[in-house]
Amino acid sequence: MPSFDVVSKVDLQEVDNVVNNVKKEVDTRYDFRGSNTELSFDKGGASISILASDDMKMRAVQEMLLANCVRRKVDPKFLDFGKVEAASKGMVKRSVAVKDGISKETAQKIVKKIKASKLKVQAAIQDDQVRVTGKKIDDLQDVIQLLRDDDFGVPLQFINMRS
């Protein structure tokens, strides 16, 4: 039976490249001269930490991160910006989580949407992905189009299309 998987995977190397590009841009921009703005990326914990001298520079770094994500073809929906917190010496810090995988709630929404479409396919949740199987490839392509039209808050990729 034909099937495919719905996943939400981020390329951590591309996120690392984005952070490095933003670091270079911060080092060369005139308005960041003399400010101790720092960015660091933790691949193991999949998080980015930003340390800036004030809120304006924090917003500028956030905009640079989003712009570089688009430029490097990393969906900005993968980034989950935390609250701005006060740090030592009058600086501000923010933690940015890099979301990877489909949460249980999102997977349930996807399955519910597929079942509500009345297409002759079955959807099953497997860890952080959803497997969709059906008798016809046309039905599977209709499901892909249905899921692309809706916004689930996470970027979706469709892999392992088997016939």
Curated annotation (Swiss-Prot):
CDD domains: YajQ_like. It comes from the Bacteria. Keywords: Nucleotide-binding. One of its GO terms (molecular function) is nucleotide binding. SUPFAM superfamilies: YajQ-like (SSF89963). GO terms for cellular component: cytosol. Nucleotide-binding protein. Belongs to the YajQ family. This is Nucleotide-binding protein Dde_2479. It comes from Oleidesulfovibrio alaskensis (strain ATCC BAA-1058 / DSM 17464 / G20).
